[in-house]
């Protein structure tokens, strides 16, 4: 029974997240249905990062086992044919050892959060950015972000319904940059860790936004982290601005 590794891109807007649910459309359900339609088999996918409703991905990784030894290009093309017109694309498929697990073999996950920082409304990217119309200082946001790096208790940036056994996480990267293209300006938050708590990236993005408009200092952000003062955090940034951009394996 060969194991296939899939690299997947999707627009999260029409889905209730990755994980299969009883009545709502999800990315996992869409792909598993496509698998059944092309192969006649019932397969269960395991992914590297179970994204929430509205969160996008440009390099999600998942694995599944099939009874038949299909050509990898056939798997890719057949799945894409059965996924249309849903905004999900299988970028590649490859056979991997049975020991490979898309979730548990991962050593690092990468996310990007996009903030459109202008007053004029977004026409083309509104489903993929958080629009903040007041001025933000990306340098102040970056300075505050550096206070969150390292191994810490991230309880202040954790969803109430988070099921992780421990709030301890090691944040390896949290960079904030401003990207300009004419009148189009975005603030991009790039972050990496082995794993994240539920809502951690969005909670950090909302808090860094307050640092960008000088409502919180870098010291304030460090104190929020140290004390777990969730009530002092910024708003939970909307899901639409978040994209899963990659995963590393040994």
From Swiss-Prot:
Substrate binds at residue 111. InterPro entries: PsdUridine_synth_cat_dom_sf (IPR020103), PsdUridine_synth_TruA (IPR001406), PsdUridine_synth_TruA_a/b_dom (IPR020097), PsdUridine_synth_TruA_C (IPR020095), TruA/RsuA/RluB/E/F_N (IPR020094). It holds the Pfam family PseudoU_synth_1. One of its GO terms (molecular function) is RNA binding. One of its GO terms (biological process) is tRNA pseudouridine synthesis. The active site is at 52 (nucleophile). Its EC number is 5.4.99.12. It comes from the Bacteria. It catalyses: uridine(38/39/40) in tRNA = pseudouridine(38/39/40) in tRNA. SUPFAM superfamilies: Pseudouridine synthase. Keywords: Isomerase, tRNA processing. Homodimer. Formation of pseudouridine at positions 38, 39 and 40 in the anticodon stem and loop of transfer RNAs. Belongs to the tRNA pseudouridine synthase TruA family. This is tRNA pseudouridine synthase A. It comes from Methylorubrum extorquens (strain CM4 / NCIMB 13688). The gene is truA.
